[in-house]
Every structure is written in structure tokens, then in C-alpha cells.
Amino acid sequence: MTDGTKTPQGGRERSEEVADQWEWWVRSACVLFGVFVVAWLVVLLRLGTPSIYVQIFGLPVLGGLSLPISLWGVIKTVFNPPVIRKSRAIGFALVLAIGFFGAVPMFPVPLATADWSTEVEFRLPFEREWETLAGGPSLSRNYHATTAAYRWGYDFAPTQEGKRYENDGESLQEFYCYGEPIVAPAAGKVVRFENDLKDFEPRDFSETSVLGNHVVLRVEPGVFLYAAHLKKGSVPLQAGDRVEKGAKIGECGNSGRAVEPHLHIHLQDRLSFPVAQSLPLRFSNYVADGESVEVGMPLGKTGEPGSRGQMVGPGD
């Protein structure tokens, strides 16, 4: 009787143990998660170039690898009962975390250049009052914050009565920004430019060029200023030209990956794009919402309905 009562219990335990053996897809998920954690540590340690490459290329690749492992797990779960197993729950939780945090930008990217500063004084790149569509250190006001190359980048456009265009904004000419002169925020040497790309109609954009027509100025060693989405044919410069602060470098356009005319501008620590670290760009002697600012970062609008970015213009 004693043997008879123990054997079924022991059999059930062995059966459950066999049923919850860790399948190869679960083991693969565990290995991938371990690599994913190490990759995030490299990013968070702000190691410069290694962290940039891991953030730009490594994390998305790991996030993408979670998809085939997930499909593998689904197939094994459907065709190999029992469906509910502790090991499978762990496996699916891991691939979900990898896929989500590897593919969805969640917070400002940590960079070794966060404390960078310079003696160069940067002026605003336009002559009258414009609205800051995106700018500042926080993700809530600056969607650029999740991207290494333009972590502290800005988008600007002029507005009238809260609108960036007249009528319905169906044509480029209806946007107040289109054709407006853009000036150099600081003196520098032209090291790269693009001037021949088309301007797209509003709500359309290039699928091949991010920056569109643009100018890159080498302000000082390891400091490169990018001004992007310029109007076709508006750049009056050639590579090697020396540009003085306040000189015209182009006109606002809608080239590249821009759904409506605006100016994008940022600093980065090397010429290569997008494999670079953004540098904090602070402007000097400007007016923000009617208040004089000696040095600061104009703040963009939040995602809340009716939100407005700071209205900024050159100071005296």
C-alpha cells in the first residue's frame, strides 16, 4: 500500500518536471536577454564611441532578434502541451522586454558629452521671432532627445497667431518659414553641404535623405554645426568657405525627412552622421517669450493639445 501511494505522486512530480523542461527557445531568450543587459550597461556607462554604436545599432538588432524567438516560442507552445509552463512565461517575458526596450525610445540617450561646454557664443540662426517646435534637455519638450547625434537639437519655425502657415497650409508658399533666410550661429568653415535636393510638398517627405539640403560648419576642433531641411538652391556656399557669424548660409525649406518647412539645427562631436554624439547647444543673448536670456536652451512645445514652444528672437 505504501509503495502504491507514493508511486503516483512521484510519477506526477517527474511528469511535471519533464513538462517544464526549459526548451531551446527559452534558453535562447535567456542568452539574448543577458547580451541585452550588457549592451544597455555599455550605453549607460557613456563610453563614447562604443556606447554610440551599441545605442544606434546594437540595441535595435537585439530588439529585432526577439521577434523570431517569440515566433519560435509561439509555435512550441501551440504544438507542445501543456501550454502553461513557468519556463515559457519567463521566456515570453524576456523577449517582450528585449523587443520593447530595444525598439522603442523611452528616455533621453545618455552621452559622454552631457557636460560639454565651449567659449563660443552661438546666436539664433534667424533674424526675427520664431517658435521653438522642439528644444531643450527634456524628452517632453524635445523629441530629438532619444537620438545620439542630435540629443540637444532644435526645430524652429516662425508663426503668426499660433499658426505656422496661412490658409490651409496646402502649399509650401503658405508656410511662413519657407524661403526665410538662415544665418550662421557662429563662425566656421564649411566642411559639407547639400544644395540640390527637392523640397517636398507639406506632409510629404524624403525616404532616402534625413537632412535634405544642409550645411555643416566646423566651428572648432570636434565641434560641427548642422543646419538642415534647407530650400533647394538656397545655399550660397562651397566646401572650404569661411563663414562669419550672422552670414547667410541658406533658406528655410522642406527637403529631407521633414513633413513641413522648418529649420533643424544641432551640434555634434564629429563629422559623421548619424554616428556621433550630440553636443549641448546653448544660444547667447536672445529673447524668449519677451524675457532676455543671456545663455540658454529654448524650450519646445510639449505633446499636450494647444501647447506652444518658446517664442525666441535675437537680442539687442
Q: Over which residues does each language-model region extend?
A:
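Membrane-embedded alpha-helical segments of integral membrane proteins
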Residues: 30-77
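Membrane-anchoring/interfacial helices and their immediately flanking loops
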Residues: 1-46
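Internal/C-terminal transmembrane anchor helices
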Residues: 83-110
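Short histidine-centered loop motifs in beta-beta connectors
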Residues: 223-246
